[in-house]
Amino acid sequence: MNGAKDIRSYGYKVGSIPCGKANLITDVPGVKVGHCTVEENGHKTGVTAVIPCDGNVFVKKPVASVFTLNGYGKTAGTIQIEELGVIETPICLTNTLNVGKVSDALVEYTIQKCAGDHIKVRSINPVVGETNDSLINPIQERAVEVHHVIQALESASEAFEQGCVGAGRGTVCCGLKGGIGSSSRVLDFAGKTYTLGALVQSNFGRMEDLMICGQPVGNRIAQELHPKNSKDEGSIMIIIGTDIPLSARQLKRVLKRAAVGLVRTGSYMGHGSGDVFIGFTNENYLPAAGKEKLLSISCFPEDRLDLVFRMAAESVEEAICNSLIYAHQETGVDGKIYHCLSEFLPE
């Protein structure tokens, strides 16, 4: 959409499982993604919204799970997902100091959405993830407002940009400009095609550790740029969406394997890195309505999950690579230049 090329255009092919039609998380039917990039008055931040299913998420409540590798983060809403195994709002990503403001906007959005369906809500669990974009964005000014969140939600569609957009506008990954990235994988089972996709907000890692398809690309870049005080800190938000029928317990198993994709790009999950995974399946729902009825869901056979694990790992690895390759060079708040990966990869 912005004319940039994905990591495959540079000759790198992540894994062996086929990708979806657009190689995006929105290859999963019903999933939509929207951005609002905030660039007024020197700000370089924003909001990215992931809508997990068609219709009212609060009413439908897709099965969901969460997993944290290193908990240096301020993500909102994960406690209830852990307890109940469902998600009841879209997932919004932003910067660290705007979690509260985005959460408030997401509550208001959900109230209005439910009012349109003649539902009066008393409790809402807004889900908001974050990374710290203060190297590039004046984060203390907390520039994100309600209308930015609503714009991201209302603009959500199957086609969306990657790189320096939305919540990825000000992120730094492995000493290079990070951003939003996505990828997907498909499998055929019992006569049906299923899709799993990943979306990341990359803001982690040391330049020297960056790996692309097993190649020490970051080390080669570091020999050219000579980074100072390189640390494995920052964060990454990883969203996994699928239409594979899974239970919340199975989803957590998938999220744990998604971490393989993060490690393969060079993360050592340092002290200051928040590594948070949120997953959902829009094949299974546990709605609150119909309290006098038993609820049932379908589940993938446990002994057939190996391929699903690999789908998650490959999707995350490629999504991180795409977040870097779609990004463009940026100047930080202290004047430092953050180069982009595409500067160092021959086409």
What are these regions (language model features)?
Residues 1-347:
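Alpha/propeptide regions of enzymes that mature by internal proteolysis
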